[in-house]
Curated annotation (Swiss-Prot):
Keywords: Antibiotic, Antimicrobial, Defensin, Disulfide bond, Secreted, Signal. Belongs to the beta-defensin family. InterPro entries: Beta_defensin_dom. It comes from the Eukaryota. Its main location: secreted. Residues 1-27 form the signal peptide. GO terms for biological process: defense response to bacterium; innate immune response. Has antimicrobial activity. It comes from Hylobates lar (Lar gibbon). It is found in: Secreted. Disulfide bonds join C46-C74, C53-C67, C57-C73. GO terms for cellular component: extracellular region. The gene is DEFB105A. This is Beta-defensin 105A.
Length: 78
């Protein structure tokens, strides 16, 4: 009886470890493509929600620091 319970817990733990691994599908926000209009998708806010992390800033925005990798923190020009 104890062997069955230990086996069940082991398989249960292995299942949750395998679920956490990426499936190879690149359908997340990190891999999203630009919109048809040429604007890049907004990923997240930056600097206490004072801007948006983008690949390129829009015409009415100015770069104000970096977010991650090669993304810029874009703020509205005043």
């Amino acid at each position: 009886m104890a062997l069955i319970r230990k086996t069940f817990y082991f398989l249960f733990a292995v299942f949750f470890i395998l679920v956490q691994l990426p499936s190879g599908c690149q359908a997340g926000l990190d891999f999203s493509q630009p919109f048809p209009s040429g604007e890049f998708a907004v990923f997240e806010s930056c600097k206490f929600s004072r801007g948006k992390c983008r690949k390129e800033c829009l015409e009415n925005e100015k770069p104000d620091g970096n977010c991650r990798l090669n993304f810029l923190c874009c703020r509205q020009s005043i």
